[in-house]
Amino acid sequence: MASQVVLSFALVVVLAVFVGQVDSCPSDCKCDYRSSQCRPANDDVHPNVCIDHYCVVMNLAKREQRPELSPGALDDSSEEKDNEASLA
């Protein structure tokens, strides 16, 4: 009996994870995770295309990946040395 409860709970958790990642917006729309409503993906899309479409969100909002910085991109010391050399 206890194993059935654990198994059914695990199934509910697995389904919740899969459902939480479903984005049911039309292709020209994107999910607004705060309101769970579909919004136009860009200015060319008419707002009525996305009306009455909702997206199911049960997990944290998707995070956009930040672009990778090349090594030394934040190192301003070489630029400062070049500026000092040109002033001398």
Swiss-Prot record:
Expressed by the venom gland. Transmembrane segments: none annotated. The keyword Signal applies. Residues 66-88 are annotated as: Disordered. One of its GO terms (cellular component) is extracellular region. One of its GO terms (molecular function) is toxin activity. Residues 79-88 form a propeptide. The keyword Cell membrane does not apply. Belongs to the scoloptoxin-XY family. This is U-scoloptoxin(XY)-Er1b. It comes from Ethmostigmus rubripes.
